[in-house]
A protein has these predicted regions:
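Short, well-ordered, mixed-charge alpha-helical segments that flank or form enzyme active sites
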Residues: 34-36, 59-62, 88
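Conserved Radical SAM active-site core
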Residues: 1-27, 33-40
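Conserved glycine-rich "GG(E/T)P / GGGxP" loop and the immediately following alpha-helix
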Residues: 1-16, 53-72, 83
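A generic structural signal for alpha->beta connector loops
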Residues: 22-24, 47-48, 76
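C-terminal helical cap(s) of enzyme catalytic domains, especially alpha/beta-barrels
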Residues: 72-78
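Charged phosphate-binding loop/patch that engages nucleotide di/tri-phosphates or the phosphate backbone
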Residues: 78-88
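Structural recognition of alpha->loop->beta junctions
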Residues: 38-60
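Short internal beta-strands
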Residues: 27-28, 52
Length: 88
């Protein structure tokens, strides 16, 4: 999702999903959930999508994100799943 104003974002994600089947597509972005959905609310209609939200904030403690299964660099970062089916 960099840059956020990409007009072909939905097409790009759909193409990635077609190539990744049956797996989930994970998008890492430094934007907030509100910023992403304000510009690209249509992504909510896609299936098997995971988005990691939140900017890196230096000098903050890391934390484990159970959706991604990794430590994220600052506590304001998190992942959210959208329309998960039987993806691997």
């Amino acid at each position: 999702l960099e840059p956020l104003d990409s007009s072909d974002l939905l097409d790009t994600i759909v193409e990635l999903q077609a190539r990744a089947k049956p797996r989930r597509v994970i998008i890492y972005t430094g934007y907030t959930e509100e910023e992403v959905l304000a510009e690209h609310s249509q992504i909510l209609s896609l299936s098997n999508l995971v988005i990691k939200y939140g900017r890196f904030v230096p000098d903050q403690p890391t934390h484990f994100d159970p959706i991604l299964g990794v430590n994220l660099a600052s506590p304001n970062q998190y992942a959210k799943e959208y329309n998960i089916t039987d993806a691997l």
